[in-house]
């Protein structure tokens, strides 16, 4: 094997190993993983260390699904008992300065399992809005405008067919901003 090549355990475990099948939980894990890597600068090594430590020492089987997961300056933390445990430094306690934007976009049920994801659609103005939702219990998990459960793909198909966005908005009781978010989401996907 050439230098620098090797096999590593994946950061996200598929729900079914053979054939590799991804679940809704895997989608949420990928959403959080992408955010940690691209927006928070967490290295793969730090992620692997954190995942291993959380599983081995804290009995957290799916760290990327944990609503207590936090990130700051390329490090991962787990909030426990009002303190932050630094998962990338073998469990040292850390200060409570965290970025929670990505985890706030996940809706959790009473058993603390993820049930709905509101993916980011745009950066800058409007980035905090949660117009689009992915929910396995709605529209078979396809992206929808959350307020009315209207498929984003249907909205874009109608626009592509030549219909005016204002007419589509009126048909579904959506705002012009909802239509714009649906188009932005579908065009980015």
PLM feature segments, named:
Residues 6-7, 17-22, 29-161, 166-172, ...:
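Long, charge-rich, low-complexity intrinsically disordered regions
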Residues 1-15:
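Major-groove DNA-recognition helix of helix-turn-helix-type DNA-binding domains
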